[in-house]
């Protein structure tokens, strides 16, 4: 029997959900909620820094996000708890005939700290990636959030010529907007090579950390020695520090973010930085 020519159109898409919660119990942070639907999971919680900081590694077993897929992730960190969320490898957004979505919702209660530190997102040419992130901080909650986006696959000779990458990020504290950003990058657009855009770089990264630091620490971060060419800088806004960089490789951008995170974490979050072991694998 001959198969119809459009069989590929019937490839199923994933609608995956992950809901996490964390609470403070005496001197430790423990998971209070772990619910999933579809292929999103978290591995066993870790305590590399001791019982106060609960680390979870979010995994997406299919390994990539295709057209029609939808990932919904939510996490709530209860009062005085500390959660650190990361990933074992890059998220890959594949070429597709229809959009794929990721929705992220994070809530951080008074006295709590959340670190959202995933590895990079690789957006293939012809992908249609659409991300929406909403973060609600309450009282004196603390946050460190970063993202690294790599457009195309230059090592394979693939430029980001078609498709789009779209993201929307809101951060609020007690209902007051701290940070609002919308991005839409079109494959093949002139801004990819323009000096007022990505200036020919294929990777861009952002780190946002709540709090304020003095000029001396800012200069110390700016003067960090990096072995690879990364164009980056930091800006102190009221209640929020912003660090951005452009690079030719995701590895270089991530190395820069890690250095900035190590420099700022003691002052803004109150703990020395301990690099998650998963980043070294």
From Swiss-Prot:
Protein's UniProt keywords contain Cytoplasm: yes
Keyword set, alphabetical order: Chaperone, Cytoplasm, Nickel insertion
GO molecular function: nickel cation binding
Record's subcellular location: Cytoplasm
Domain of life according to the entry: Bacteria
Annotated Gene Ontology cellular component terms: cytoplasm
A Pfam family: UreD
Predominant localisation class: cytoplasm
Claim: Chaperone is one of the keywords in the record: yes
Family: Belongs to the UreD family.
Main function: Required for maturation of urease via the functional incorporation of the urease nickel metallocenter.
Subunit: UreD, UreF and UreG form a complex that acts as a GTP-hydrolysis-dependent molecular chaperone, activating the urease apoprotein by helping to assemble the nickel containing metallocenter of UreC. The UreE protein probably delivers the nickel.
Name of this chain's protein: Urease accessory protein UreD 2
Annotated organism of origin: Pseudomonas syringae pv. syringae (strain B728a)
Taxonomic placement: Bacteria, Pseudomonadati, Pseudomonadota, Gammaproteobacteria, Pseudomonadales
Gene: ureD2
């Amino acid at each position: 029997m001959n198969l119809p020519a459009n069989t590929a159109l019937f490839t199923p898409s994933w609608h995956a959900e992950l809901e996490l919660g964390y609470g403070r119990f005496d001197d430790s942070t423990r998971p209070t909620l772990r619910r999933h639907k579809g292929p999103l999971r978290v591995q066993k919680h870790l305590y590399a820094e001791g019982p106060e900081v609960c680390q979870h590694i979010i995994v997406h077993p299919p390994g990539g996000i295709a057209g029609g897929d939808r990932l919904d992730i939510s996490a709530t960190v209860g009062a005085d708890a500390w959660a650190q969320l990361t990933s074992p490898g890059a998220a890959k957004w594949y070429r597709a005939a229809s959009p794929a979505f990721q929705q992220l919702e994070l809530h951080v209660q008074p006295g709590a700290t959340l670190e959202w530190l995933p590895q990079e997102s690789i957006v293939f040419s012809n992908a249609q990636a659409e991300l929406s992130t909403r973060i609600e901080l309450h009282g004196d909650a603390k946050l460190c959030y970063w993202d690294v986006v790599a457009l195309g696959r230059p090592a394979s000779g693939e430029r980001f010529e078609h498709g789009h990458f779209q993201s929307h990020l809101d951060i609020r504290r007690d209902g007051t907007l701290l940070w609002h950003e919308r991005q839409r990058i079109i494959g093949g657009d002139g801004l990819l090579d323009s000096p007022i855009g990505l200036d020919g770089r294929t990777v861009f990264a952002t780190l946002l950390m709540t709090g304020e630091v003095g000029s001396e620490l800012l200069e110390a971060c700016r003067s960090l020695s990096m072995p690879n060419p990364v164009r980056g800088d930091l800006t102190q806004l009221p209640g929020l520090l912003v660090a951005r960089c452009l690079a030719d490789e995701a590895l270089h951008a991530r190395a820069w973010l890690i250095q900035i995170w190590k420099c700022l974490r003691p002052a803004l979050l109150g703990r020395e930085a301990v690099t998650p072991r998963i980043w070294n694998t």
